[in-house]
């Protein structure tokens, strides 16, 4: 049994790992490269898609599923296994990707082909491919997110996918993996633990209360899948503590995900399930309006506060949030709240550095609004959670992280006696 990384090797995006065992070739994830690595989506995979026997997808984020249509474009015609929640979310995610790609590397016919080959596989169900057996475990990162267990040739491999932050309320905690000979593990936040979630929520509510009380707008850049809905859940469960104000979900894609959530109840935490069992939707706080059309979005810029606006893109790479920032950052009554990762060199990181003004959509905008960064909302496991999950002293190969963060985690694993290395693109690792 061997595992060969073809993405997310000493980087965060592009997850794709080829498992070779029992005469079978199984691809674990097929993710898009993003940010400065985007051009690599046009490059060959590094293996022949026509020779792959099956694909397993851990969750519906683009950096794990975004090259799947390209795989079909280049000749793959086999099954694609994912949990039912991932299957349903992928239709939204891949169709949206078609609209936002600057230089498309697949077309609508490839998306249709890929979606037609999806096969649901639930947690704990074993998939048999000859002498190879595979199953999903709960990863707690998105509804339906999973890690993969692969057994064959007398060896066991675990691939973490993306592991969730276990302090959060919306999703179940990640399950512990079985004993394994090798774990291919993510290390997105391998260099630090997260701030406690309860403290993060408390600070978030204080920002909202202050800003709304003075008639301001709270501008929240959000990811359309999971993070936007999580913030809505916080507003639902704590809204009674806040001044009354409209809440605008200014993201049609996030709105589609929101509409899907009642069909995914069993993938949420027991706390969330309890709300649904009482006939309530805890992702729809009082005063919520989903903004579908561009003209309605622009009208929010002219409307007075108080209000809460959630809009994409979460990393300010484009989208409606840029118009809200262009019109809102110059008003000292307003607040900009980052609840997700902001990459170095991006507009978000520039704003966090608090210059007197920033350039948005071709205009210099004075930065007078308050700016807040709340890292405790992260959807990834922090360093302490990763160390806990990797108990049992398996050999570990680290993926899905910037090199310095993987090195920091690797050092701690080595200090407790575990054999650890960092993945290299195209270099196979024996299990």
From Swiss-Prot:
GO terms for molecular function: metal ion binding; RNA binding; RNA endonuclease activity. Pfam families: Beta-Casp, Lactamase_B, RMMBL. Keywords: Cytoplasm, Endonuclease, Hydrolase, Metal-binding, Nuclease, RNA-binding, rRNA processing, Zinc. Zn(2+) 2 binds at residues 63-64, 162, 400. It is found in: Cytoplasm. GO terms for cellular component: cytoplasm. Binds 2 Zn(2+) ions. Its EC number is 3.1.-.-. It comes from the Bacteria. Has endoribonuclease activity towards 23S and 16S rRNA (in vitro). This is Ribonuclease TTHA0252.
């Amino acid at each position: 049994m061997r595992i060969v990384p073809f993405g997310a090797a000493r980087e965060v995006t592009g997850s794709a790992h080829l498992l070779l065992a029992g005469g079978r070739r199984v691809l674990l994830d097929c993710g898009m490269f993003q940010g400065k690595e985007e051009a690599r989506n046009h490059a060959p995979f590094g293996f022949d898609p026509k020779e792959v026997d099956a694909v397993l997808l851990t969750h519906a984020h683009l950096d794990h599923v975004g090259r799947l249509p390209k795989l079909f474009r280049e000749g793959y015609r086999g099954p694609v296994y994912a949990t039912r929640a991932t299957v349903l979310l992928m239709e939204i995610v891949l169709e949206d990707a078609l609209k936002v790609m600057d230089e498309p590397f697949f077309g609508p016919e490839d998306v249709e082909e890929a979606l037609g080959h999806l096969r649901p596989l639930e947690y704990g169900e074993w998939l048999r491919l000859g002498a190879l057996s595979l199953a999903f475990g709960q990863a707690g990162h998105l509804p339906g997110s999973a890690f993969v267990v692969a057994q064959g040739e007398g060896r066991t491999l675990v691939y973490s996918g993306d592991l969730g932050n276990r302090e959060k309320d919306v999703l179940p905690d990640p399950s512990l993996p079985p004993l394994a000979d090798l774990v291919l593990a993510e290390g997105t936040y391998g260099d630090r633990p997260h701030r406690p979630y309860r403290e993060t929520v408390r600070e978030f509510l204080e920002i909202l209360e202050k800003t709304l009380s003075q008639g301001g707008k709270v501008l929240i850049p959000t990811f359309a899948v999971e993070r936007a809905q999580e913030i809505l859940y916080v507003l639902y469960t704590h809204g009674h503590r806040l001044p009354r104000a409209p809440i605008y979900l200014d993201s049609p894609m996030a709105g589609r995900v929101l509409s899907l959530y009642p069909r995914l109840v069993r993938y949420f935490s027991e706390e969330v399930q309890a709300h649904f069992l009482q006939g309530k939707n805890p992702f729809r706080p009082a005063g919520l309006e989903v903004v579908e059309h561009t003209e309605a979005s622009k009208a929010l810029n002219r409307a007075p506060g108080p209000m809460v606006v959630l809009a994409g893109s979460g990393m300010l790479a484009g989208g409606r949030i840029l118009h809200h920032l262009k019109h809102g950052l110059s008003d000292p009554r307003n607040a900009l709240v980052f609840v997700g990762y902001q990459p170095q060199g991006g507009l978000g990181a520039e704003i966090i550095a608090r210059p007197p003004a920033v350039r948005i959509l071709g205009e210099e905008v004075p930065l007078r609004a308050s700016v807040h960064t709340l890292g405790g909302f992260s959807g990834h496991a922090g360093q302490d959670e990763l160390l806990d999950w990797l108990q049992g002293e398996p050999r570990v190969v680290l993926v899905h992280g910037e090199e310095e963060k993987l090195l920091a985690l690797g050092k701690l694993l080595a200090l407790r006696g575990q054999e650890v290395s960092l993945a290299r693109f195209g270099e196979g690792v024996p299990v």
